[in-house]
């Protein structure tokens, strides 16, 4: 039975109240713009939440909220990893998924610290983890095809992944969540992300490929060669963003893309982590440009292609810490800044409230 095509209806955020929202920000007890990027972030969040509620209240009566923030970590294996494009073998994907489930990874530590709920989704690792609670089964296969030899997956598998992702987001939306963050785990997925980036942005592979988790120069050369072979092999089939995912993507990248689209469809805030998550966002924006309004980019990673993708998406990340771990770690660390932008908007006194002469 074939999987029917999945589409998303994503509304752009309303900018009708921008002048009033900006006035609300500017009248806080500070010089205009003194809170820097937190101010533009507050404006973005206010737009999204005003669009969601379709409220007619004046912005001064609007309270911004972050409710049940949830970190979704999508895991999948990649056929190209068998060619030695990473410092670790594919078996490490499964081992790290177990580590997530047992609470021992960096993402677990950071989620506990900042207040994220964490959910781990098996999108298609080589061997499923049996008998361990806390892993959601959304398997699309046992690892993708090796993209330099064959498509990563069938086009209908992309739609199946999108449908699964939409159901996942709907469950969290029904539970009241209004902010989801995206992380991943998959040995070889920087190769898939770099291939996606090169295909969509029409760049040379060398401008997209980095050292991932820290590969040496010999491995880097092999990685470059294999991605170039993949792009050459699939050149005639890369007719659109879904085809790019089918030919070059990963099961976890597919489901991240679908989940970002589904979250924007439900007018939820979407926090994007690093290089791989940004590649998923890149595809999502190609499918539905309005999704960009809902995306908050957490950080600029140490992966050399990430800055180019961020610039292409006109994104200014909140953090730049030299991270190259993935898992959603940068997105987790950005949550306190997102909450700070909400808190200053809601709680900071205006000049008139405080009896202070306005600073212009």
Curated annotation (Swiss-Prot):
Annotated catalysed reactions: 5,6-dimethylbenzimidazole + nicotinate beta-D-ribonucleotide = alpha-ribazole 5'-phosphate + nicotinate + H(+)
Coiled coil, from the record: none
Top-level lineage group: Bacteria
EC number: 2.4.2.21
The protein's annotated pathway: Nucleoside biosynthesis; alpha-ribazole biosynthesis; alpha-ribazole from 5,6-dimethylbenzimidazole: step 1/2
Active-site residues, record numbering mapped to chain: 327 (proton acceptor)
UniProt-recorded Gene Ontology molecular function terms: nicotinate-nucleotide-dimethylbenzimidazole phosphoribosyltransferase activity
Keywords (A to Z) from UniProt: Cobalamin biosynthesis, Glycosyltransferase, Transferase
Keyword check for Glycosyltransferase: yes
GO biological process, one term: cobalamin biosynthetic process
Listed PANTHER family: NICOTINATE-NUCLEOTIDE--DIMETHYLBENZIMIDAZOLE PHOSPHORIBOSYLTRANSFERASE
Sequence similarity: Belongs to the CobT family.
Function: Catalyzes the synthesis of alpha-ribazole-5'-phosphate from nicotinate mononucleotide (NAMN) and 5,6-dimethylbenzimidazole (DMB).
Matches recorded under NCBIfam families: cobT_DBIPRT (TIGR03160), PRK00105.1 (NF000996)
Protein name (record): Nicotinate-nucleotide--dimethylbenzimidazole phosphoribosyltransferase
Organism: Shewanella baltica (strain OS195)
């Amino acid at each position: 039975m074939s999987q029917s095509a999945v589409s998303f209806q994503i509304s752009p955020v309303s900018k009708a109240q921008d002048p009033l929202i900006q006035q609300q920000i500017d009248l806080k007890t500070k010089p205009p713009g003194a809170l820097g990027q937190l101010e533009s972030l507050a404006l973005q969040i206010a737009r999204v939440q005003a669009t969601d509620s379709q409220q007619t209240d004046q912005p001064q009566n609007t309270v911004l909220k972050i409710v049940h923030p949830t970190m979704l970590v999508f895991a999948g294996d990649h056929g190209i990893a068998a060619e030695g494009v990473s410092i670790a073998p594919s078996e490490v994907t499964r081992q790290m998924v177990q580590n997530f489930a047992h609470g021992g990874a960096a993402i677990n530590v950071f989620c506990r610290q900042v207040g994220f709920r964490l959910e781990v989704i098996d999108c298609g690792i080589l061997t499923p983890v049996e008998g361990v609670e806390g892993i959601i089964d959304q398997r699309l296969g046992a690892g993708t095809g090796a993209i330099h030899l064959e498509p990563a997956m069938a086009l209908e598998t992309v739609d199946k992944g999108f449908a699964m992702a939409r159901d996942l987001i709907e469950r969290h939306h029904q539970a009241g969540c209004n902010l989801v963050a995206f992380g991943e785990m998959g040995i070889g997925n920087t190769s898939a992300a770099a291939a996606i980036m090169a295909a969509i942005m029409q760049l040379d592979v060398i401008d997209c490929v980095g050292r991932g988790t820290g590969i040496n120069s010999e491995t880097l050369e092999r990685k470059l060669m294999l991605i170039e072979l993949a792009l050459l092999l699939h050149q005639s089939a890369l007719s659109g963003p879904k085809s790019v995912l089918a030919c070059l993507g990963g099961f976890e990248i597919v489901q991240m893309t679908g989940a970002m689209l589904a979250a924007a469809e439900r007018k939820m805030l979407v926090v994007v982590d690093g290089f791989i998550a940004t590649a998923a966002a890149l595809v999502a924006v190609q499918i539905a440009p309005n999704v960009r309004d809902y995306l908050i980019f957490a950080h600029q990673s140490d992966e050399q292609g990430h800055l180019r993708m961020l610039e292409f998406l006109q994104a200014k990340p909140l953090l730049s810490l030299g991270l190259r771990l993935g898992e959603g770690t940068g997105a987790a660390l950005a949550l306190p800044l997102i909450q700070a932008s909400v808190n200053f908007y809601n709680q900071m006194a205006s000049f008139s409230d405080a009896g202070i002469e306005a600073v212009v």
